[in-house]
From Swiss-Prot:
Manner of cofactor binding, per the entry note: Binds 1 FMN per monomer.
Keywords per UniProt: Flavoprotein, FMN, NAD, NADP, Nucleotide-binding, Oxidoreductase
Organism per entry: Geotalea uraniireducens (strain Rf4) (Geobacter uraniireducens)
Domain Flavodoxin-like positions: 3-194
Name of the protein this chain belongs to: NAD(P)H dehydrogenase (quinone)
């Protein structure tokens, strides 16, 4: 049973969340977990102006995802930063290249799940995940969120990410915040939750 985590991260927040998602998925017996990043679309000079070059270098060891890997997976957990309440352009361009999979019905019946980040507490995390779900549903995927069985969603003693739609984290306007332990716990729970359902469906 193969679980694919496909993400884009500019400053490392989604990368760290992806690692936590993978940790959770690997807790499920029989789960083969792959972490992949979607292709970068911004030129090097733009990344340099945005102060993202060093982080990109740190993630260089993560293989770039191919369209074929989506078809090979039993479950796909996507990670994207929020861009104006939607998925980032890099993820959008990657998914726009999946028309061939749609024509063949290659993703029909596979599990799909999403996690995200935003600069601010109300920066569009829920709209990003919900609008992402539209693409998954058009592909015939079965959408999985983050249930309230994860008790960390009920905390009000600190600023946290996460919703029933998926795990999330708040990066800060300058990227100064790292995912909190609660955010990472949510990501682990989501990874394990998706992998557990995939394992049951694979029997």
């Amino acid at each position: 049973m193969k679980v694919l985590i496909a993400y884009y991260s500019m400053y490392g927040h989604i990368h760290r969340m992806a690692e936590a998602v993978a940790e959770g998925a690997r807790e499920v017996a029989g789960a083969e977990v792959l972490i992949r990043r979607v292709p970068e679309t911004l030129p090097a000079d733009v990344l340099e102006k945005m102060g993202a070059v060093e982080t990109q270098k740190k993630m260089a060891q993560i293989p770039v995802c191919t369209i074929g890997e989506l078809a090979d997976a039993d479950a796909i957990i996507f990670g994207t930063p929020t861009r104006f309440g939607n998925m980032c352009g890099q993820m959008r361009q990657f998914l726009d290249a999946t028309g061939g999979l749609w024509m063949k019905g290659s993703l029909v019946g596979k599990l799909g799940s999403v996690f995200t980040s935003s600069a601010t507490q109300h920066g569009g995390q829920e709209s990003t995940i919900l609008s992402f779900h539209i693409t998954l549903l058009h592909q015939g995927m079965v959408v999985v969120g983050l249930p309230y069985a994860f008790q960390g969603q009920m905390r009000n003693d600190e600023i946290i990410g996460g919703s029933p739609y998926g795990a999330s984290t708040i990066a800060g306007t300058q990227g100064e915040r790292s995912p909190s332990e609660n955010d990472l716990a949510a990501a682990r729970y989501q990874g394990k939750h998706v992998a557990s359902i995939a394992a049951r469906l694979a029997r």
